[in-house]
């Protein structure tokens, strides 16, 4: 632990946290400063020029990262009939209707994404107090309430990231892992940021993207110089 702290202290001493970093240098510093024995996530926090107290300025959406997030995504699917076979073939870990709802209530099964066919929403809405706070409530805008169960599962498994601003107008998301190639992290970030830009509400005035910070799970957080972006 002392060796780790000593190395981290040196890294922090060598980094100017007041500086705005170009995207390539920023990613390089995050990778260089990683000093834990697990594959850290690369996270982004985007401070938006919105009023989160006004419902017409809140942002919610999703996008598919070209290189995925680097984690094994467990999917729960609320559906019935022929869709059960489709969901199994597509790789969903948990599938069902009332029985799946009971599993969630009583066993507290863990998953990263919940998908539902429209005819299952009566059951899903009963789980609002459980799924809502965890950001797992299926939503048509996110493509997680759909008749195309196969596509929704594929998207979730291959890098779909759902996002929404918090009460402070900040969006948080994971866009990769520390062992990704620099260009992979950069391409994931560019796709994510482009999605946020497209989601700008008309009611938002002034500077929309105020600040962008990239960080690793246990490492440093650095502020991006937005002039270095090509999008």
Swiss-Prot record:
Coiled-coil segments on the chain, per record: none
Biological processes, Gene Ontology terms: regulation of translation; translation
Gene3D superfamilies referenced in this protein's UniProt entry, alphabetically: 3.30.190.20, 3.40.50.790
One GO CC annotation: cytosolic large ribosomal subunit
Family recorded in the similarity comment: Belongs to the universal ribosomal protein uL1 family.
HAMAP family attached to this UniProt entry: Ribosomal_uL1_B
Protein name as annotated: Large ribosomal subunit protein uL1
Species: Buchnera aphidicola subsp. Schizaphis graminum (strain Sg)
């Amino acid at each position: 632990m002392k060796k780790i702290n000593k190395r981290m202290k040196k890294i922090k001493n060598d980094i100017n946290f007041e500086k705005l970093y170009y995207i390539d240098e920023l990613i390089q510093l995050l990778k260089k400063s990683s000093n834990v024995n697990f594959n850290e996530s690369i996270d982004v926090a985007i401070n938006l020029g919105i009023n989160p107290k006004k419902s017409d300025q809140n942002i919610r959406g999703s996008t598919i990262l070209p290189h995925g997030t680097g984690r094994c995504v467990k999917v729960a699917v609320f559906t019935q009939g022929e869709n059960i076979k489709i969901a199994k073939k597509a790789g969903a870990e948990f599938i069902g209707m009332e029985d799946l709802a009971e599993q969630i209530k009583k066993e507290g099964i863990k998953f990263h994404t919940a998908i539902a066919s429209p005819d299952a929403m009566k059951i899903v809405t009963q789980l609002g107090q459980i799924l809502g706070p965890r950001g797992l409530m299926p939503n048509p805008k996110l493509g997680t309430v759909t008749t195309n169960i196969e596509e929704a599962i594929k998207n979730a498994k291959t890098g779909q990231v759902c996002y929404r601003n918090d009460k402070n107008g900040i969006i948080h998301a994971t866009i990769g892992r520390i062992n990704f190639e620099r260009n992979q992290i950069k391409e994931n970030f560019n796709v994510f940021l482009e999605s946020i830009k497209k989601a700008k509400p008309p009611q938002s005035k002034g500077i929309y993207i105020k600040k962008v910070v990239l960080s690793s799970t246990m490492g440093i957080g650095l502020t991006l110089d937005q002039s270095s972006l090509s999008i």
